[in-house]
Amino acid sequence: MWSEKEKGCMKMKVGFIGLGIMGRPMAKNLLNAGVELLVSDLNKEAVADVVAAGAKEATYAEIGEQCGRIIIMVPSGAISKSILFDEDGVASTIKEGTVVCDMSSVTPVESKECYEGLKDKGVGFVDAPVSGGEPGAVAGTLAIMAGGDQEDFDAMKEYFDIL
């Protein structure tokens, strides 16, 4: 469980998983805004680039354990579910009170499965696909279409404002 002292954009570590065409500039925008970021991606060149900008590399389990807010930006819902629920995935170490935001393009069924699987652990989930492409990701002007419980949306809003 996260204490009140640990909550808030500039106080809580944020995990960012998926540093592709969209995710890499999104992660850099968060870093530029002063967010402490732990990152993971299969592409080690992308990880090295974002680490050079100030992030720290971490495994999925380390992100689950250390981060109060977690953003996922990967190509599919199947990948999101694997990142979350595989044996050494984010959910294996996640703390109650954490909020996970999947910004990938996923089906409603996949989103609901993630929501339900995390809710059982006392973890919030926001489904928040984006529009604006790479130029919007670089400029920090993405249109974000978020769905989830109000308190979880509120927990992610200050990050959405950066993205």
Which role fits each region the language model picked out?
Residues L19, S105-L163:
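Rossmann-fold dinucleotide-binding core
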Residues G8-I72, E134:
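NAD(P)+-binding Rossmann beta1-loop-alpha1 motif at the extreme N-terminus of oxidoreductases
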Residues Y60-F125:
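Rossmann-fold NAD(P) dinucleotide-binding segment
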Residues L42-N43, S76, D149:
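Residues in the short beta-alpha loop(s) of Rossmann-like NAD(P)-binding domains
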Residues A53-A55, I71, P75, L118, ...:
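Short low-complexity, flexible loop/linker segments enriched in glycine and/or proline
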